[in-house]
């Protein structure tokens, strides 16, 4: 059992109890043999884990009147890596205890997670340049890239690296599943002080770095049931529902409408209609015409 899963179990258990004594925590720990192996949890171990949890997740576990509690629960309510890790490892714990029904639990593979992700994360930690051969799907031409790794992002079941390419003198995104001959160099770099990964992608859709596309407020209408889907799983972090009618909703997003954005809306078929701005609406109409021409009889 990895230490991270033990940390996740500790966080989830304390969160569910709000406040819990060491004795209660130890009993629950020993009872969950898939995590503990049947061993109890002592104070010294818990305090060591508490320090590791604070450093790794930014979650502060405090003790008052012999009761342990999470002092900054707001961290758990925020989106981002901490919440993603908690959800992921909580799911793994549940699946590990469900081997009897493993044939009835279906998942989607993320093949790129097996390709260089650990190496890239280590390079991120050490601010070291990485080098790899990259082959785009578009042209199939392999290129050697030397990159300052800025961040990684998971999108549509693929991991991507955002970094500054030394050869092309600019920020680029790279799909891990298109990399070969990967290596970490000894050369170090300094991450720009003003770089914020979340802020950088806040006006982008997906993994695009097309800063030449103007950032706009796009208004679109979604019909039932897709309005419900979009309400449950927003298209973008800026999404707002500005109107709710009988069988439809009107949403707004603030982003750079790139190909990935249009592609995502097109995937909803006739259940989504762009209302404004006119330029974005026209671009969508042109795409629909091009799609229609593929099905016209010669």
Regions found by a protein language model. Give the residues of each.
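Short, basic/aromatic recognition patches that contact phosphate-bearing ligands
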Residues: 1-82, 290-298
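Bulky hydrophobic/aromatic content
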Residues: 8, 22, 57-58, 62-136
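A residue-level signal for conserved active-site and pocket-lining positions in enzyme catalytic cores
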Residues: 10, 46, 127, 220, ...
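A structural signal for short hydrophobic beta-strand segments in well-ordered beta-sheet cores
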Residues: 61, 152, 182, 241-242
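General beta-strand recognition
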Residues: 69, 131, 160-162, 250, ...
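Core beta-strand-centered patch of the WYL/Sm-like small regulatory domain
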Residues: 104-219
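Polybasic (Lys/Arg-rich)
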Residues: 202-298
């Amino acid at each position: 059992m990895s230490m991270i899963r033990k940390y996740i179990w500790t966080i989830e258990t304390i969160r569910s109890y709000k406040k819990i004594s060491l004795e209660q925590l130890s009993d629950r720990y020993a009872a969950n043999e898939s995590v503990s192996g049947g061993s109890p949890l002592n104070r010294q171990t818990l305090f060591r884990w508490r320090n590791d949890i604070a450093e790794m997740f930014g979650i502060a576990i405090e003790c008052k009147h012999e009761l342990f509690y999470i002092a900054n629960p707001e961290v758990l309510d925020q989106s981002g890596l901490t919440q993603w890790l908690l959800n992921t490892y909580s799911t793994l714990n549940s699946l590990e205890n469900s081997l009897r029904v493993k044939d009835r639990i279906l998942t989607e593979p993320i093949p790129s997670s097996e390709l260089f992700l650990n190496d890239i994360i280590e390079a991120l930690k050490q601010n070291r340049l990485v080098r790899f051969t990259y082959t785009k799907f578009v042209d199939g031409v392999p290129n050697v890239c030397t990159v300052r790794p800025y961040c990684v992002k998971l999108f549509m079941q693929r991991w991507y690296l955002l970094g500054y390419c030394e050869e092309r003198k600019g920020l680029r995104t790279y799909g891990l599943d298109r990399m070969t001959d990967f290596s970490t160099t000894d050369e170090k770099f300094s991450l720009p002080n003003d770089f914020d990964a979340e802020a950088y992608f806040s006006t982008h859709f997906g993994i695009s770095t097309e800063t030449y596309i103007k950032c706009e407020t796009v208004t679109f209408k979604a019909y039932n049931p897709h309005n419900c889907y979009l309400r449950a799983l927003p298209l973008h972090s800026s999404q707002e529902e500005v109107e709710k009618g009988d069988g439809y909703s009107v949403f707004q997003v603030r982003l750079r409408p790139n190909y990935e954005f249009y592609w995502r809306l097109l995937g909803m078929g006739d259940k989504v209609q762009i209302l404004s701005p006119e330029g974005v609406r026209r671009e969508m109409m042109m795409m629909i015409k091009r799609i229609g021409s593929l099905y016209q009889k010669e």
